[in-house]
Design a protein with these regions (language model features):
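Internal, well-ordered domain-core segments that constitute the primary functional module
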Residues: 170-249
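Outer-membrane beta-barrel proteins
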Residues: 59, 101-107, 145-147, 193-195, ...
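C-terminal closing repeat unit and adjoining cap/tail of repeat-based domains
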Residues: 426-437
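Gram-negative outer-membrane beta-barrel proteins
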Residues: 77-85, 123, 137-143, 165-167, ...
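Cleavable N-terminal export/targeting peptides
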Residues: 1-62
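Beta-barrel outer-membrane channel/assembly domains of diderm bacteria
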Residues: 40-172, 210-213, 220, 251, ...
Length: 478
């Protein structure tokens, strides 16, 4: 599940730094001048003391030292036309079981939050350290106390060193880290779908920003992910074994071009029983070639990204790297992601997205999964604090499962349209938060999709055909 990436990419840290520094200067000035006027010191002494005081508080005001807090959170109600909780989520369709997301606007029934605590310090030799702790929780209950059904969890706990005094040459600007974390650069997402293009997380060690030239740099890392309690006896489905998937990563940048390569190894995972046979992969490879543009496909101001991903074996889960231990030894997947944002005049914004994947021999020999999602988010700014948001999402899928986990073969379309009056402190961009929105959504799909029975929402009670849903939601990050 995606989380919370925009607060990292689209922060207003510059403005916050200025405000912090202004407050710090004011407080320091008042304190120093008040005490020293009483002591009858000279102007020069008072200025010298003030400069020393500012030197002490300025790193904290800039955010270079001390504690800070970040968050991502969303919370809302999603109701059907009978006033009861409705099924929802970007992965509610059969294709969602293999990563096929649809639009999230007016389609999220949960409360999800991340509380991120940071502590930064600078050693006497100039080396910087950053400790981060992320605590996350998720629930679909509307109650205020959800300890029984929540999912409180520590998602990150790591330390990172930068500006290391002993690093020179190509390592002069490098950062060294260890612990449990989301990879800094392999955590970029298509926000409208709540889908990462690629996501790497786990426990390990790495080196960022090995700089070979102004335009060429690389990141290297080793992550571990646990495969727990999988069956290794054909006569039982009980979990009897476990192993670890080790992921060795090289993430390279050549200007706007990104090339990622991952190698994976999970000892004894080939003893896993999937579909009554032991043909699971114990190794794999995944690669991605991406381009990040600073315009809207060269047509107007804005931005865009295009990514082509391919994986085999354990790498056939091309998005959530190393996360799926059931993949077949011959599994192969290819995915493409295209998305961008731009303005259509002074008061309109648009963000189109295409995400598609084809895979074969994914879980059992002979299966084939194909799906494509087209999504567009549109916003019309109507005042200083109000805008109308619209989202249209269409997905087509052809899933031939060969009976994996009792799933049926399905072939069909899903479509959804949402209108969402939205309030915010200031309009002006897709990344301005917080937002408070109300919404109405209409979704429809082919009846055949109800037969998939792979844990998806379609075909469940009160959710077997065309649906209206209504609700409200807040979303915030900083």
């Amino acid at each position: 599940m995606n989380t919370c990436k925009p607060y990292c990419m689209f922060s207003n840290s510059g403005a916050l730094t200025i405000r912090r520094l202004t407050v710090a200067v004011t407080m320091a000035s008042l304190a120093v001048f008040a005490s020293q006027l009483q002591a009858g010191e000279s102007v020069e002494d008072r200025l010298s003391a003030l400069e020393q005081q500012l030197a002490e508080v300025e790193p904290h005001a800039r955010g270079d030292e001390g504690f800070s807090f970040n968050t991502y959170a969303r919370s809302g109600l999603l109701l059907n036309n009978e006033g009861k909780s409705a099924s929802g989520g970007p992965y509610l369709t059969p294709a969602g079981s293999v990563g096929g997301a649809v639009g999230r606007l007016g389609n999220e029934p949960d409360t999800y939050l991340e509380a991120i605590l940071n502590y930064k310090s600078v050693a006497d030799n100039g080396t910087r350290s950053h400790y981060r702790l992320m605590i996350a929780d998720s629930t679909t209950s509307s109650n205020d106390w959800t300890a029984d059904d929540g999912a409180l969890n520590v998602r990150q706990a790591y330390v990172e060193f930068s500006n290391l005094a002993g690093f020179t040459g190509i390592f002069e600007n490098a950062s060294l880290w260890a612990g449990k974390r989301f990879d800094r650069d392999l955590d970029f997402d298509i926000h409208w779908l709540d889908s990462d293009v690629v996501f790497l997380a786990g426990t390990g060690v790495g080196l960022y920003d090995v700089t070979f030239s102004d335009a060429v740099k690389s990141n290297f890392s080793l992550y571990g992910r646990s495969f727990l309690d999988f069956p290794s006896d054909p006569d039982t489905t009980d979990g009897t074994s476990d192993t670890d998937n080790l992921i060795l990563t090289a993430n390279n940048y050549f200007g706007n071009v990104q090339w990622l390569i991952n190698g994976m190894s999970a000892a004894d995972n080939d003893e896993r029983v999937v579909g009554n046979v032991m043909e699971a992969a114990d190794s794999g490879v995944q690669t991605m070639l991406a381009y990040h543009g600073d315009s809207f496909f060269g047509l107007s101001e804005g931005n865009f990204s295009v990514a082509l991903l391919h994986g085999q074996g354990l790498g056939a889960e091309v998005k959530s790297l190393g996360a799926d231990g059931n993949l077949h030894e011959d599994a192969a997947s290819t995915r493409i992601a295209v998305y961008g944002t731009t303005r259509l005049g002074d008061s309109w914004r648009i963000a189109p997205t295409i995400l598609a994947e084809t895979s074969e021999d994914r879980y059992v020999d002979g299966d084939e999964y194909q799906w494509l999602t087209f999504n567009t988010r549109l916003a019309n700014e109507l005042g200083a604090n109000f805008e109308m948001q619209y989202e249209a999402s269409w997905q087509v899928m052809d899933l031939e499962t060969e009976g994996y986990e009792g799933r049926g073969d399905v072939d069909g379309d899903y479509a959804r349209f949402t209108i969402a009056p939205t309030f915010k402190p200031q309009v002006g961009g897709f990344w301005n938060r917080p937002e408070i929105r109300v919404f109405a959504s209409y979704s429809t799909w082919d009846d055949e999709l109800n037969q998939y029975d792979g844990g998806d929402a379609l075909g469940q009670e009160d959710f077997a055909g065309s649906q209206w849903t209504f609700g409200t939601q807040m979303e915030v990050w900083f």
